[in-house]
Amino acid sequence: MERVGEHPVPVGPLAVRWHAYELEQPRAGVAGSARLRLENAGTAPWRSRGREGVQLSYHWLDPLGNAIVWDGPRTAFPSAVQPGETVEVEAGVLGPRPPGSYRLAFDLVEELRFWFQEVGSAPLELPVDVQPRISERRLGLVMHGAPDAETEAALNTQEEPLVEDEPVAVAHLVAGALPEPDWSRRLLDAHEEGYAAVGGAIDPESRTDRRRLVSWAPGGGRNPRFGHPLLLPSLLDGLQPESHEGLPSYAGSDALFEGRAIVRLRSRSGRPSG
């Protein structure tokens, strides 16, 4: 564990002295962990009461100290920490989006009342370089249905060519799906930024499909709170597509609708019905 240097410790009932820490390398959007050794340097015990009482948490700040994520997940103490007692705690840490330079500020919070920093204690602030979620930009493909020459031609024009070996993300298309040239780049950009699932906009050829798929029409921008399943999604390892409106889909969390990643869709002729 890395030793923490000297820092101000107030006199009073609520005070913390940080002794040491160990931090797993954060990646954008990925749940990691940290181990902290800290001392109750005040005169009052710390007691966690389920989700209330004294909890360990953190803020993600930008390099200037502005809050990017104010409320990190809470970690309760398994038992009361008495004045003068030193404990080690393992805490979950969720990497912020997008990757980049941040400051990770650990603090204690008296839930629904105040952070210890607000009553004079110093948080443990660490400079952190958050890495992209994916270590390599390698996009593979699963084609649902029969091979299609026009789809194959569109894939051959991609700004970032698709790979067959060791992909880190896999996109799901159907025959007659014609991605725009920047489609693969935009999917990989979003995965790097921290999303496990990314789906683009659908631009159908037929009027019937345009009405049916109006919620996925181009022009919607980027939306991490999209109210519909992603269609023709790109998924990181371990995620599998389902089916919605006869197309491969994904309806889980940790997902982004990328309205600039456009896939033109021929009429249903030659595609699986569903």
PLM regions with names:
Residues L178-L213:
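Conserved donor NDP-sugar-binding/catalytic core segment of glycosyltransferases
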Residues W216-G238, S243-G259, V263-P272:
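A recurrent flexible, glycine/aromatic-enriched loop bordering the glycosyltransferase active site
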Residues Q131-T157:
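N-proximal low-complexity "stem/linker" segments adjacent to membrane-targeting elements
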Residues L38-A44:
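Asparagine-centered strand-capping/turn motif at beta-strand->loop junctions
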Residues L94-G100:
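Short, surface-exposed loop/turn segments at beta-strand-coil junctions that are enriched for proline
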Residues A15-W18, G53, S57-F77, G120:
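Short beta-strand and strand-turn-strand segments in soluble, beta-rich domains
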Residues E2-A28, E125:
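Low-complexity, acidic Ser/Thr/Pro/Gly-rich terminal tails and inter-domain linkers that flank the onset
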